[in-house]
Amino acid sequence: MTRSVWLKADDAVGDWEARKRRITAGLEAGVDWVLVDERDVSRVRELGQVNVAAFAGDDVHVMDAEEQPDAEPDAVIVGKEGEGDGTVDLPSDFSGSADLTTLRRAEAPAGAYVRILDQDYESFAETAAVDADYTIVIGDDWQIIPLENLIARIGDETDLIAGVQTAEEAETAFETLELGADAVLLDTDNPDEIRATVEARDATERETLDLQRATVTEIEETGSADRVCVDTASMLEHDEGMLVGSMSRGLFFVHAETADSPYVASRPFRVNAGAVHAYVRTPDGGTKYLAELSSGDEVQVVDTDGNTREAIVGRAKIEKRPMFRIEAELENGDRIETLLQNAETIKVATDEGRRSVTELEAGDELLIYYEDVARHFGEAVEESIIEK
C-alpha cells in the first residue's frame, strides 16, 4: 500500500496569504495532495506541482479543460457545507442524500468529506465509500474505534483518508489495525508538523532488514578494476551505508564516507561501493548493477540496525582503482564475496565496529544482508542460479 499526505488549505485556514503559506510549506515538505476550495485550484497550480483536490461548490461540473485547464482539480470532494460536515442534517434514508447524489454525478474522480459526529455519520461514510474514490473522515473528538470500524468495513472500496492535526496522530492513523488508513488529511500551519507527517508517511513504506554476520574467510588483492563511488543527494549518518556485493543473495554493508581521515576530507554523501559488476540494493527490495546507476536513480540507504531510507543518486563516479576480493561465510555454510577498493577510507561494519578494508583479516565478522533468492533483472525469481 502506498500512503499519502493530504494538506487542508481551504477558506477555513484564513485568507489567501495564510492559505498560500500553508500550501508552500506543504510543497516544500513533499505532501501528495492539497485540498482547497474550487476558486484556488489554479493558484495552487502556479505554486508548484502537486495533486489538487477541490471542495465542490453549488455546481460540481468541472470546467472545460480547453477553457481553463489549470482550474480543473484532480479530484472533487463533496460534503463541505452539506450533509457530510453536519451543516445540513443527514436524511433518515441515505437514498435521499443530496451529497451522495452529487458524489455519483461528479464528472471527475470524486471523494466524500464526512465529520464523524456519531454512529449515523459512520454509517454515512460507509455508504459514501461505495461510490467515492476517496473517503475523508474527520473526528472532532477523534477516537481510534471509529477509524478501526471504517478500516474494517470499507476495505479496498475507496482510499480512506483520516483527518489529523499532528504527525503523531498521522502515525497512529497509518498503523491502526495494522492496515492503517490509506492517507491522512493534515490540518496545521506548523511547517515542522507538516514535515514530520511526511516523514511518518515515508516511514510506513520503509522496510527494516534483518542483517546478520558472516565470517571473513579470504581477502586478497586482485589488481585494478572499474570502481563506482555513489554520490547521493543526501547527507548520510555515521552508522549508515549501502548493501553491495558480487552475489545478489548476499550483500555486504559498506559504510558511507562520514569518518574523518588524515588523507582526505570526509564525504558524508558518498559510498565507495565497489566494482561496476556489483549489485546495490534499491528501495523496492530489488537490486541494480552499480554500472547502471545514474543521476536521479534511487538507492536504499541502511543503518547498522537494519533501518532503511531512500536516497537520490546525484552522481555515479567510475574510476580505475586497485581492489580487494573479500569472501565471507555464513552460518549456513554459504559463501559470498565482493570487490572493494584497496583504500583506507573504505570501511565495513565488523563485530568490533567500523573497520577499514585494509585492516580486515580472516576471522573478522562482517555485517551482511542475506536472502536465499535468485534475481533476474534485479527482481527476485524462483529459479536456481549459480553465482561464483
Swiss-Prot record:
The keyword Protein biosynthesis is assigned to this record:
no
Class in the EC hierarchy, top level: oxidoreductase
Which example biological process does GO assign this protein? aromatic amino acid family biosynthetic process
Q: Where is the signal peptide?
A: none
> Which catalysed reactions does the entry list for this protein?
2-amino-2,3,7-trideoxy-D-lyxo-hept-6-ulosonate + NAD(+) + H2O = 3-dehydroquinate + NH4(+) + NADH + H(+)
**Assigned EC number:** 1.4.1.24
Please give the superkingdom of this protein's source: Archaea
| Gene Ontology MF terms in the entry | 3-dehydroquinate synthase activity; dehydroquinate synthase activity; NAD binding
Question: InterPro entries annotated for this entry?
Answer: DHQ_synth
Alphabetically ordered keywords of this record:
Amino-acid biosynthesis, Aromatic amino acid biosynthesis, NAD, Oxidoreductase
One Pfam family in the UniProt entry: DHQS
- State the family named in the UniProt similarity comment for this chain: Belongs to the archaeal-type DHQ synthase family.
Job of this protein: Catalyzes the oxidative deamination and cyclization of 2-amino-3,7-dideoxy-D-threo-hept-6-ulosonic acid (ADH) to yield 3-dehydroquinate (DHQ), which is fed into the canonical shikimic pathway of aromatic amino acid biosynthesis.
Name this protein carries in UniProt: 3-dehydroquinate synthase
Its ancestry begins with: Archaea, Methanobacteriati, Methanobacteriota, Stenosarchaea group, Halobacteria
